[in-house]
């Protein structure tokens, strides 16, 4: 750190929405934090739209460095950090939840203009900056050691950030080894990774459900023999027959990751769950899901919303990756230099399936 007192970082002015590559002092870690040299940072498919203010999220009151997830090496640890060490390679995750004993602790996604829960504005004021920089200061509680993954390229390890979100949904519904699970939206960014995660968790069959037959086939091929592509036609009877045939009957559990304008595919998957089946909702479809009380009651269905994942989830995925159960090698990085962030944001919406957009430092 003595030789790196300055760094390059992208700064966003929340008033003008102007994004500029700047020289900034390299951050020094406060108590409970670490400074990480960033090797790779993830660019979300909607990042350009997000930073332009088109999604209606609440921005910080002052300029900040955007960027959510990353891979890097710890350079310095602050006081009160007991386990993280300089030189340790880590995965950086953004889901910060206030560590206090209350019913609804404040939470936010670091480097992402959105806040959730009372007190989140204060939380964001303390932890403003994200990963689109050569160095970041990050809470030690949100970096996960990845030494067990050896010399795997940072852009490949960044697949952990793609996988951990659907993992949170599958944990929410208690996916068990040997079960049959449907991933709705499996041709999308998170849904495709959900197929790999469900396989790693021991599902006997994973139905990769969606509209894009070509991408679904690619995702299923990457997953192996237990992954079955199910391209939907929009014909409820035909889609039901395809799901039932592939599952060998009813489905035990499902994860919904769709962002389409219609919830029709969600309803189709739901109605192919067995009695007592579970559905995790993690998508962003704006259309309500129409389901009657009687139908819910008669089938003992559980429908659960899930935002993000438990704090121990990234560590679980590192171990699943190190053992070979989670196939990070199936992730397809699209790489850009830090200075090329605008180009990366322009092209990120074109991602399909197991692709990921990454800045390489």
Model-derived regions, located:
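NAD(P)H dinucleotide-binding glycine-rich loop of Rossmann-like/cofactor-binding domains
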Residues: 96-182
């Amino acid at each position: 750190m003595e030789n790196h007192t300055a760094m390059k970082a992208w700064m966003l002015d929340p008033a003008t929405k102007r994004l500029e590559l700047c020289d900034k002092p390299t951050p020094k870690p406060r108590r409970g934090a670490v400074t990480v040299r960033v090797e790779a940072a993830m660019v979300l498919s909607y990042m350009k739209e997000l930073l332009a203010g088109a999604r209606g999220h609440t921005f910080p009151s002052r300029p900040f460095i955007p960027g959510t997830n990353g891979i890097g090496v710890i350079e310095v640890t602050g006081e009160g950090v007991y386990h993280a060490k300089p030189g340790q390679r880590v995965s950086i995750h953004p889901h910060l939840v206030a560590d206090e004993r209350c019913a609804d602790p404040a939470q936010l996604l670091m480097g992402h203009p959105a806040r959730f829960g009372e007190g989140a504005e204060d939380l964001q004021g303390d932890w403003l900056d994200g990963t689109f920089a050569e160095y970041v200061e990050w809470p030690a509680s949100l970096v996960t050691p990845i030494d067990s993954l050896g010399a795997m390229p940072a852009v490949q390890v960044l697949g952990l950030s793609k996988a951990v979100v659907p993992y949170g949904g599958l944990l929410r519904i208690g996916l068990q080894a040997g079960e049959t699970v449907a991933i709705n939206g499996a041709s999308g960014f998170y849904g495709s990774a959900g197929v790999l995660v469900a396989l790693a968790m021991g599902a006997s069959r994973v139905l990769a459900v969606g509209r894009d037959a070509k991408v679904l086939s690619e995702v299923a091929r990457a997953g192996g023999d237990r992954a079955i592509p199910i391209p939907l036609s929009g014909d409820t009877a035909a889609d039901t027959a395809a799901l039932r045939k592939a599952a060998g009957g009813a489905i035990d559990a499902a994860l919904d990751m769709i962002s389409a304008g219609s919830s029709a595919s969600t309803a189709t998957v739901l109605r192919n769950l067995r009695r007592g089946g579970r559905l995790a909702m993690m998508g962003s479809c704006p259309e309500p899901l129409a389901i009657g009380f009687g139908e819910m009651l008669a089938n003992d269905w559980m429908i659960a919303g899930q935002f993000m994942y438990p704090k121990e989830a990234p560590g679980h995925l590192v171990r699943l990756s190190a053992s070979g159960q989670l196939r990070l090698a199936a992730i397809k990085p699209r790489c850009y230099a830090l200075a090329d962030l605008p180009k990366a944001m322009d092209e990120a919406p074109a991602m399909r399936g197991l692709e990921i957009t990454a800045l390489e430092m």
